[in-house]
Curated annotation (Swiss-Prot):
The gene is Slc66a1. GO terms for biological process: intracellular amino acid homeostasis; L-arginine transmembrane transport; lysine transport. Keywords: Amino-acid transport, Glycoprotein, Lysosome, Membrane, Repeat, Transmembrane, Transmembrane helix, Transport. One of its GO terms (cellular component) is lysosomal membrane. One of its GO terms (molecular function) is L-histidine transmembrane transporter activity. This is Lysosomal amino acid transporter 1 homolog. The lineage of its organism: Eukaryota, Metazoa, Chordata, Craniata, Vertebrata. It comes from Mus musculus.
Length: 293
């Protein structure tokens, strides 16, 4: 594995030692149980984010109304946030594993966007427009990402701490922000803002439709779980040597806001699922014919 060759050179910089495989794979200096728990939660959060879109793919194929159920601005905001993470993974010299994970998230978002336009164009008169435009959209996104992926340089670089879906990070320490840190902080803030703003159009769409039909709740449930675990993984990690807790939280503030802050909006969407589904169940029971006496 490419990222495995990057860990041996600076293992001595870990003051109290580290779990070897955690250092080899992530370059993370896991000094105690808190750091190990942080890495474990981060890994589970990645699995949650990676699996979150599959239920929506299945739901879209079953219902065929994804273009009505999901807000386009929700999808664009989501892919915008993940794209910022992808850009930041290159600017901040992230590990190849983290970069490939960021690429996967963007490709998963492109697949969601492809399904959206597939069902939107499918309603047009030309029967060929839907598959052609969907395939072209996915190919275009893949072509745009492939040069970035192929340009990943496997030369050893300063190692960042382990991250979940939000891959951007900055150097530890109490010193003022460097230019590189400022760029990462700005991109991370933009990413968090896009994640937050993306929920508002979806909440509005659900409210206007008074329905959540066509949306898989597993999409939001897994994202909520992933964001919770990621936020906890950041909070559980020990600050670096010589770094205060306040400095650590300040350096990671945008990503904490992007993960834990969005939970409030996802909770609102969860409430919409409960309310509108109860209405739909009641309406369906009213439409059932009365049994003959």
């Amino acid at each position: 594995m490419v990222w495995r060759t990057l860990g041996a050179s600076n293992f001595s910089t870990c003051p109290n030692g580290s779990v070897q495989w955690i250092w080899d794979v992530f370059g993370e200096c896991a000094q105690d149980g808190w750091d190990e728990a942080s890495v474990g939660l981060g890994l589970v959060s990645i699995l949650c984010f990676a699996a979150s879109t599959f239920p929506q793919y299945i739901k879209a194929c079953k219902t065929g109304n994804m273009d009505q159920a999901l807000s386009l601005w929700f999808l664009l905001g989501w892919i915008g946030g993940d794209s910022c993470n992808l850009i930041g993974s290159f600017l901040a010299d992230q590990l190849p594993l983290q970069t490939y994970t960021a690429v996967y998230y963007v490709l998963a978002d492109l697949m969601m966007l492809t399904l959206y336009f597939h069902y939107k164009f499918k309603k047009r008169p030309s029967p060929l427009s839907a598959p052609i435009n969907s395939v072209l959209l996915f190919i275009l996104g893949t072509v745009c990402i492939t040069p970035l992926l192929s340009s990943t340089d496997p030369v050893a670089v300063p190692r960042e701490g382990f991250r979940g879906r939000t891959l951007l990070s900055v150097e530890p320490g109490n010193k003022p922000f460097t230019k590189k840190e400022v760029i990462g902080f700005v991109i991370g803030s933009a990413s968090s803002l896009l994640y937050l703003l993306s929920r508002l159009p979806q909440i509005r769409t659900n409210f206007i439709r008074q329905s959540t039909q066509g949306i898989s709740y597993s999409l939001f449930a897994l994202v909520m779980l992933g964001n919770t675990l990621y936020g906890l993984s950041v909070l559980l990690k020990n600050p670096e040597v010589g770094q205060s807790e306040g400095s650590y939280l300040l350096h990671h503030l945008p990503w904490l806001v992007g993960s834990l802050g969005v939970l409030l909006l996802d909770t609102i969407i969860s409430i919409q699922f409960l309310v509108y589904r109860s209405h739909e169940t009641a309406a369906a029971s009213e439409r059932e014919p009365l049994l003959p006496s």
